[in-house]
A protein has these predicted regions:
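Membrane-embedded transport module
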Residues: 224, 263, 477-527, 542-716
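Cytosolic catalytic regions of P-type ion-transporting ATPases
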Residues: 62-66, 94-207, 488-498, 502, ...
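Transmembrane helix-loop-helix hairpins at the membrane interface
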Residues: 18-98, 105-106, 151, 208, ...
Length: 793
């Protein structure tokens, strides 16, 4: 069958709609805005604005209203940005279906499959839609998703394969009869909201930190007004407004948003690098990996097999003819590749009758061969013949070739079992296939070594082939283990054996799972790659399961955390880099966020204890919080990675997020900002309260900008990289400086923000104070570089 034409498929797609189940409609913008207005912090601002209006200050109330609009807009924009990133990732990870259109087979997005399409089914793929089988060859389907019955159902031509069920063996062709909600799966689907994913370890840590800081923030926002009232016995109304503004500025409501946005945008960056994240917690786990178990074919090599050598005792013509028959002769029966047998068998029809053609590992074929084809015809296979043939296979493997053996025998008219088909064979010869190493594999493996990440190549190939390929990509094989050797070891012995090995040959997916669990028991954080149905347990068990996007099965992709669009090992390394960059940026954002809040509390508390007015009007505190939130939730997320990030050992995810080094750096940053603002405020106090407050306000905002640019590098100096390497932060910094100039020069803004005109000398005082404060932060960074040159903050 030629299948549908592309124009006809497009018409049917318009008529029947996409091949997907009906999803919950996205929330309209007005509902998101209402939810934003219902946030506790926004309600607190609304209450503050209402008090301003009630107490006869409509200008301040209007200013707070503008800030509320800006904050809600920022929050909704950030959430939509994260949702768009996640939706784009979901679309990238959507499975495809093999369809025949215009006489050609191509991969099409599953959503574009339409009634009338001819789809090709094979082991490891899900059935894309309800489809009536046109042909079936040993086809068995797992229908447990529909029926709950775990025993695979044998399928023949004429029967229906249902959408969402899994092909566990064999292959077939089918014509689609129903898609989307019209399928059996669509009729059974419940109208249920999608379950929320469980919180990640980092998410839990951030929420616990937020709860702890919430208590401190409430204490500060209540204590400061009370102490001020007791010491000064002043008017109550300004103190109430100051307390509300402090509560708004101090409560760490942005931290969960910072985490969600960081993870979502980090996942989008990974997608640009061909690593499609299916589970968001994988983004944070990638940066903690200590070990990677990787496939060879297609990951370290190009998966571009070229025939390099032929070894045929009876002549190459017989060998090539058998391979041609496998692909071109009419197929009577097929036994797909079996990992335990390491054989794939077909029974084809030829002019002279049926023939069994077997392809597989040399030792597996040799053990089932009773004869060998020689120039004079078939001869009995002696033990000496068998050893000589396997020695030839080993010689090819030693040259780094992937070696396959071919054998055949006549087939009678009746059906054969697999055991019958794969016994009494005549050995035809060997095919040596060359799979070129990926040029980027060697530097990627070197990067792993530098980063403290162990790499183990796990392959089904001959040990000699595996060792040659390992050396070609720069992976010194050391002791070469085989799957058979692992079978004879206890779990403890497996862990010990893996210590000195970089290659496991003749391995099965079951061996992959043992390797993963053995490493995890030893405290390693493990990534594993896989593409087959049987790889799913190892992919699910690993800390990060990585499936192949090109040749991988649906089952492997569904069990994985990350899908590689290009099947390239170097992409895994790039993903690890992104994971480390993401966590480093999250720490920077939180460090900046907490330092600013601590500095604000210290500045306000000092002024109260000295018997002075609070340095900031309530409306100024609210505006300052807006600028700080923008930097923490957007600018730091866009920060590129620091040099030397992959020279550090992997992060331990069990370590406290707010560790001693980070607390020390937060204290230093807060001290720098506190000293700058306090010095400028006290210096300007003799010229009047309004003047001093304005200088403090200007110093605070300029200090914010300088501190952000200093903290964007944990170890490098302020001037270590150009300011334009982070365009988001540069734009935010320029906007903040422009706002400062307008706030002291534009009469309308001066009234709204309670600022006074400043002379150039006042600006110089603010700038000098900021330089002094940032100098303290830079001095502390320099001390860390000297004391621990190779350790992350």
């Amino acid at each position: 069958m030629t299948g549908l034409s592309e124009p006809e498929a497009a018409r049917r797609l318009r008529r029947h709609g996409p091949n997907r189940l009906r999803e919950k409609e996205p929330e309209p913008l007005w509902e998101e805005l209402l939810e934003g207005l219902a946030e506790p912090m926004i309600l607190l601002l609304l209450g503050t604005g209402a008090l301003y209006a009630l107490w006869g200050e409509p200008g301040d109330a209007a200013t707070i209203l503008v800030v509320i609009v800006a904050l809600v807009a920022v929050e909704v924009t950030g959430e939509r940005r994260a949702e768009r990133a996640v939706a784009a990732l979901r679309q990238l990870s959507e499975p495809t279906a093999a369809v025949r259109r215009d006489g050609r087979v191509r991969e099409a997005p599953r959503e574009e499959v339409v009634p009338g399409d001819v789809v090709l089914l094979e082991s490891g793929r899900r059935v894309p839609a309800d489809a009536r089988l046109l042909a079936a060859h040993g086809l068995a389907v797992d229908e447990s998703a529909l029926t709950g019955e775990s025993v695979p159902m044998e399928k023949e031509a004429g029967l229906v394969a249902f959408s969402g069920t899994l092909v566990v063996r064999g292959r077939g062709e089918a014509e689609v009869v129903a898609t989307g909600d019209a399928t059996e799966l669509g009729r059974l689907a419940h109208r249920a909201r999608e379950a929320r994913p469980p919180p990640t370890p980092l998410d839990r840590a951030m929420r616990e930190l937020s709860r702890s800081l919430l208590v401190a923030a409430i204490a500060v926002s209540l204590t400061v007004p009370m102490v001020a009232w007791l010491l000064r016995d002043g008017a109550v109304r300004p103190l109430i407004l100051t307390g509300l503004a402090l509560a708004f500025a101090m409560i760490p409501e942005e931290m969960p948003i910072i985490l969600a946005l960081t993870l979502a945008l980090g996942a989008r960056r990974l997608a640009r690098r061909n690593a499609i994240v299916r589970r968001m917690d994988a983004v944070e786990t990638l940066g903690t990996l200590t070990a990677i178990a990787t496939d060879k074919t297609g990951t370290l090599t190009e998966n571009r097999l070229e025939v390099a050598r032929l070894v045929a005792p009876g002549g190459e013509g017989h060998l090539l003819e058998a391979e041609r028959l496998r692909g071109e002769a009419p197929l009577r029966m097929e036994f797909p590749f079996d990992r335990s047998r390491r054989l794939a068998t077909v029974i084809v029809e030829t002019a002279s009758g049926g023939r069994v053609v077997v392809k597989g590992a040399p030792e597996a074929v040799a053990s089932r061969a009773t004869r060998v084809l020689t120039p004079s015809g078939p001869e009995a296979m002696s033990e000496e013949n068998r050893e000589a043939l396997l020695a030839e296979a080993e010689a090819l493997a030693q040259d780094g070739l992937r070696v396959l053996a071919l054998a055949e025998k006549p087939a009678g008219p009746g059906a054969l079992t697999r055991d019958e088909a794969e016994s009494g064979l005549t050995w035809l010869g060997l095919i040596g296939l060359h799979d070129p190493p990926r040029p980027e594999a060697r530097p990627a493996l070197e990067a792993c070594r530098t980063a403290g990440i162990r790499v183990l190549m796990v392959t089904g190939d001959h040990p000699k082939t595996a060792a040659a390929v390992a050396r070609a990509v720069g992976l010194e094989p050391g002791q070469i283990l085989t799957g058979a050797e692992l079978d004879g070891l206890t779990d403890e012995e497996v862990r010990e054996a893996l210590e000195g090995a970089a290659v496991v040959a003749r391995a099965t997916p079951e061996h992959k799972l043992r390797i993963v669990t053995a490493w995890q028991a030893a405290g390693e954080r493990v990534a594993v790659t896989g593409d087959g149905v049987n790889d799913a347990p190892a992919l699910a068990a690993a800390d990060v399961g990585i499936a192949m996007g090109r040749g991988g099965t649906d089952v492997a992709r569904e069990a994985s955390d990350v899908v590689l669009a290009d099947d390239d090992f170097a992409t895994i390394v790039r993903a690890v880099v992104e994971g480390r960059v993401l966590f480093a940026n999250l720490r920077k954002a939180v460090r900046y966020y907490l330092a600013c809040k601590a500095a604000l509390a210290a500045v306000v508390l000092l002024s109260v204890l000295l018997g002075l007015s609070v340095p900031f009007a309530p409306v100024q505190i609210i505006v300052m919080e807006l600028f700080m939130d923008l930097a923490a939730s957007a600018a730091f997320v866009a920060e590129p990675g620091e040099s030397g990030l992959m020279s550090r050992p992997p992060r331990d995810p069990r370590a406290r997020f707010l560790d001693r080094a980070m607390v020390a750096s937060i204290f230093t940053a807060a001290a720098g900002l506190f000293l700058a603002v306090s010095a400028a405020y006290l210096w300007s106090w003799p010229r009047g309260e309004a003047h001093a407050r304005t200088v403090a306000f200007v110093t605070w905002l300029l200090g914010h900008v300088a501190l952000a640019f200093s903290l964007r590098r944990e170890r490098e100096p302020f001037t270590g990289r150009g300011l334009a390497t982070n365009r988001v932060m540069l734009a935010w910094g320029l906007a903040t400086v422009a706002f400062v100039l307008l706030a002291v020069r534009l009469p309308t803004l001066r009234v709204a923000l309670k600022t006074a005109p400043l002379a150039a000398a006042d600006g110089a005082v603010a700038v000098a104070a900021v330089i002094g404060g940032v100098a303290l932060v830079e001095w502390a960074k320099r001390r860390r570089r000297i004391d621990s040159p190779a350790v992350a903050d």
